[in-house]
Amino acid sequence: MDSDMEISLDRLPIKRLESIEENGAERFPSDVDYDDKRVSLIRRIDFAWALEEEDELKKKKQKKSSKDSVEQWKWKGMVENLQLAHQELTVIIDLIDTVQANDAVTVAGMTRPKPMPNEILSDLAVSTATKLQGYRNLGNYFKQSAKALEQKINREARFYGALIRLQRNWKVKRQRMLASNASNEGFTIDLSDSSLYDPTSGFRPSTLSTIRVDHDSAGMLAINVPQDSWYSLRFGYVGLNPIGNSNESDEHIDSTTGHDIPGTSEKLSASDDKYVKETHSLLREVHKSIFAEQLFDMLNREAFNEGVGFNISGLRENFMEMSIGQGASLFVSLHPSGKNPSIKKSESATLLIESSGRVEPAEGGDYRLKKLGFPNRTSYEIYLQQIFHEHAFGKAKDQLKSKSIRASNQTEKDSNSGLLDHFCLSLTHRIFSNRVLVHLESVVCKVPYLHLISHPTWNSRTSSWTVFMTVPPSIIPQGRSETQSPDGKRNLKTQFRTKVVVKDDCISVEAECTPNVVGLLKSSSCNLFSINKYECDVADLPVMILQQVASQIVCWLLEEARTVGTKASREFLSLSLEIVEGERVSLVAHVNPEDAKGCISWWLVMENGCTEEREGVSESRKLLGHLSLDVLYSVLMDLINLCGTGRNALERL
């Protein structure tokens, strides 16, 4: 070979045996790298002597500095600082002069000394801590932003959720011109319905027809209505009812929407439901107030027209008093329904006292109302609102439809009568009909075999009742009857009816078995089952009803007597049977509405020869008393047995 090859050999590391396992395998310690060796060597260096010397030097310097500081001049530090500043300023001035002289200025390169390991670790720790703090601040910012966004979404959800629920029942409009910021969404609730009004009616628009919807800080829908700005209609009888509403609750709905919102979601949901219900109730009150104002405005215009059923006796702001028939006076007023209506309420009460002068305490008012025949004021307050609703709202709807078949719409049929006049006539009729009903109930309650039925007339100025009586069945077999119709059936009635009809303040009675006047004057009986109709007044009504019932009983007994062939005749309220020639016995009815035991009593009277043979009038007349229909029928059968024809007929049965 031309050249020599040099081979360098390192010493083989001596590996000391660490352990020998049971199977003979040898385990050696792991190799240590260069850095670890250097670190272990550095750790072996003892710097304790250097630290001790350094500590001694520091202690000496501290002692010396403490001595010098006591003896130093107080301005020495400031002088040193000024000297250093002067040196630095001199260097800067020299550098500026050199640059201005265009001399070459060279900056010698400097190398940064290699940092120590502890400095690197310190810088890394500071950088990591700074970044960690920045991440924490960023996380907190994101959390706050997410929480604020969630609260905003919840507020929007609450607002629009409540608005959607209200939109189911109310007309919600959006005014885009008003939506200038997030707190005001520009929504309004329209409570008017101008499309249904008659253009010629002339209703004044209400200030409460449009209500602005706000968005409060809690995210809930808020409507602001001024206090004492809405009213409710009050109706009553002067001298019998107070002007205030006795059914009015002490708690009023707040016109603002400030509520404390609970924190939990369940309570929040419950409070939202309650809040929407309260808002709905408030809108209902405002809507009712608009309706009441329009109704009162219509009544004021109707009051200046001539009416048959009323006379205006007092007219003030939000108050009207009128006199109607049957000696009754009523008032209609607008009563404040806000949160503090005490002042206006006292003013209205004072006005009522001054206008009527007949205000009395309400104790025992229900009994007195019933006694005088006055109906429930709440029902007629509803009726007044109902006829106005039909006139104002129903009239516009019916223009495109056929006319309604309801008989209650009396105002369309009577073009000469206004709504107020029709209402007063209806109320007068109800007072009068209640008094008629009191008399009918008094008669029916005293006579056990009478019954009273009330018929609906579907007319506010017409009332109808029926007094009916069911008689016992006949004991005469059908085949042995002498009064039969062509089809073979007996003409016997089992029920008798008396119909009483009241129209306005006129009473008409229609009944069976009423003999006409001509037949009575001729002393002859008329058709037993003829139906006659006549009129009477309230004072004579009980007597007329009792006479009619007694006449029907006599008709029934007469028909039963003729069935067996007995000679019998009828003279108004008496039934006469001929015992023998020249002798007659009569069953006479006597009516007395004031008799609490039965109102109808019966007498047995002997006539002609019997009367002449007996001494004293008392022997020819005998009081039978108040008899039931079964007992009357038995008395009739006993009288028939006394008669020759009737006795023979009964023996052949």
Curated annotation (Swiss-Prot):
GO CC annotation, single: mediator complex
GO function terms (MF aspect): transcription coregulator activity
Keywords: Nucleus, Transcription, Transcription regulation
GO biological process: miRNA processing; regulation of transcription by RNA polymerase II
Predominant cellular place of this UniProt entry's protein: nucleus
Residue ranges, annotated region (Disordered): 246-271
Residues in coiled coil: none
Record keyword Nucleus present: yes
Subcellular location as annotated: Nucleus
Pfam assignment, any one: Med17
Assembly with partners or alone: Component of the Mediator complex.
Family per record: Belongs to the Mediator complex subunit 17 family.
The protein's role, per its UniProt record: Component of the Mediator complex, a coactivator involved in the regulated transcription of nearly all RNA polymerase II-dependent genes. Mediator functions as a bridge to convey information from gene-specific regulatory proteins to the basal RNA polymerase II transcription machinery. The Mediator complex, having a compact conformation in its free form, is recruited to promoters by direct interactions with regulatory proteins and serves for the assembly of a functional preinitiation complex with RNA polymerase II and the general transcription factors.
Name of the molecule in the record: Mediator of RNA polymerase II transcription subunit 17
Species for this entry: Arabidopsis thaliana
